[in-house]
Swiss-Prot record:
Cofactor note: Binds 2 magnesium ions per tetramer.
One Gene Ontology cellular component annotation held by this UniProt entry: cytoplasm
NCBIfam families listed in its UniProt record: pheS
Required co-factors: Mg(2+)
EC number: 6.1.1.20
Family: Belongs to the class-II aminoacyl-tRNA synthetase family. Phe-tRNA synthetase alpha subunit type 1 subfamily.
Entry superkingdom: Bacteria
Protein name as it appears in the record: Phenylalanine--tRNA ligase alpha subunit
Keywords: Aminoacyl-tRNA synthetase, ATP-binding, Cytoplasm, Ligase, Magnesium, Metal-binding, Nucleotide-binding, Protein biosynthesis
Complexes and interactors: Tetramer of two alpha and two beta subunits.
GO molecular function per UniProt: ATP binding; catalytic activity, acting on a protein; magnesium ion binding; phenylalanine-tRNA ligase activity; transferase activity; tRNA binding
Residues that, per the record, bind Mg(2+): E255
Catalytic activity: tRNA(Phe) + L-phenylalanine + ATP = L-phenylalanyl-tRNA(Phe) + AMP + diphosphate + H(+)
Amino acid sequence: MEQKLRTLAQEALAALESAKTPEALNDIRVKYLGKKGEVTQLLRGMGALSAEERPRVGQVANEVRASIEQALEERNARVKEAQKEQMLAAETIDVTLPGNQFGLGRMHPLTQVMQEIESIFMGLGFKIAEGPEVELDYYNFEALNLPKDHPARDMQDTFFINPEVLLRTHTSPVQVRTMEKMVPQVPIKIICPGRVYRRDDDATHSPMFHQVEGLVVDKHITFADLKGVLATFARQMFGLDTKTRLRPSYFPFTEPSAEVDISCFNCKGNGCRVCKGSGWLEILGSGMVHPRVLEMSGYNPEEVTGFAFGMGVERIAMLKYGIDDLRLLFDNDLRFLSQF
C-alpha cells in the first residue's frame, strides 16, 4: 500500500505540472483527493492492515495528501499569474498609436480687445468698476442730465422692462453709482467695461454690444488731462505713431464734449477706403463731466471737476482687425474667429 500511495503521489504531481488552467487543476484535485478519488479509495483499505502496518501507512498517506495539496496550491498560483500576464499582454495600450486630436481654444477677439483696453488703462492707474445690466431709469438717464422729457433720449433706442426699469444703454450708470458711493472722497479714477443694449441691428450695430467708459474726478482736472489720457491710450492701442484730434460734439452728461479721432493706421493719414478718404477714424466720445451730473451725485462742481469718455469695444475691434461687418463677431463661425 505504501508503494501504491507513493506512485499515486508521483502521478498527481506530474499531472499538476502539465495543467494549464484552473479547471484542469480542479479535475486533478477531484481525481486524487475527492471523495471518490484514488488516494481516498486506497486509504479505505487500511482496515485490512495489521496493527503494526497501520501507523506507518497512515503517516505515508498524510505525507502524500499534504504533498499533493501543497503542489496543487503552488501550481494554482502560477496558473493564475500566467493568466494575468497573458490578459495584460492582450490589453496593453499601444503608446505609439496617435491619440484623439482636440482643437485648442482661444479667446474671442472681443475678449482680447476688452482685456487689452483694460490693461492699458490699469497701467495708467485706473481701477475697474462694474454695475448691473438691468438698470433703473434714474441711473441710466436722469442722473446723467437726461430727464424724462429730454430730446436726447431719442438718440438711444432703449429696451424697457417697465417704465422705471430697463436694460442699460451704456455703462455710464456705473460712474454715477461709483460717485454716490465715493462722495465726498477724491480722486475717482475708474473704467467701466460691460455689456449694453440698444434696439439696433445691422452691419455696424448690434442689439447687444460692449462698452468701456472711463471717469476721472478730482480737484483741478482739466480738458488737457482728458486729451493726454486719450492720446496715450490711442498710441498704446494702435501704435506709437498714432495721432489724435478732438472735434466738438454734444453729449448731455459732458460739457464741453468732443469726439476723438485717430490718424488712420492703414494709410497713415493719407486717405484710403478704411477712413473713407479723410485720413481719420472716429474711436470714442468724451468730455468734461457736466456740473449737474457732479451735483446730482453729491459733489460740489465748484470744488471738483472731472472728465469722462466712452468707446464701443466692437468698434475698436473692427478698426484694429479690419472687420467690415459687426455681425461676424457674433456668428460663432470658427473659420472667422480662429484668425485672431
